[in-house]
Amino acid sequence: VRNAPFEINGVFFSDGHFVRMPEEDAKKVNEGVYGLCSCTAGGRVRFSTDSDFLAVIADLNSVCPMSHAPYVLSAGFDIYRDNEYFKTVQPPLDFSLGVYTTVVPADGKMHSYTVVMPCYGGVRSLLIGVGEGAQLKSPVPFRDSAPVIYYGSSITQGGCASRPGLT
């Protein structure tokens, strides 16, 4: 997903994994910010395809199971199709770290997809597979491309949401 036509928003790739801000900058703020900068909350990958399936191949370098939040929040990905919720993918419950693959059936029509990264997990790599012969295109552009920076607490973030796309 690090190459066109995929578009990454909310995170960037640095030192072998996705981060919300450079780790050196996070260290300068405080330990809390540094500790959370590798969590991929808010990370999204956008693209368009007419594939009849999507293969999500995720390599997680951290999973943060919590007693007060669902497992999918730290290890799963939400998929939106044409700006509407489509599917949630997550590894099996006995998964700890590493790679997992999920194949999601689709209808073979051209759609714009957004894959939302885990809120509290860490993502080393994310691959999206499509069917042979399927078109893979850039996503539909945002209506307003100006960036928005919003600061708040874990409540603002959606810290205990039921799935990643709700953060």
Predicted regions mapped to residue ranges:
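N-terminal secretory targeting modules
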Residues: 1-147
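Catalytic nucleophile-elbow at a beta strand-turn-alpha helix junction centered on a G-D-S/GDSL motif
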Residues: 145-165
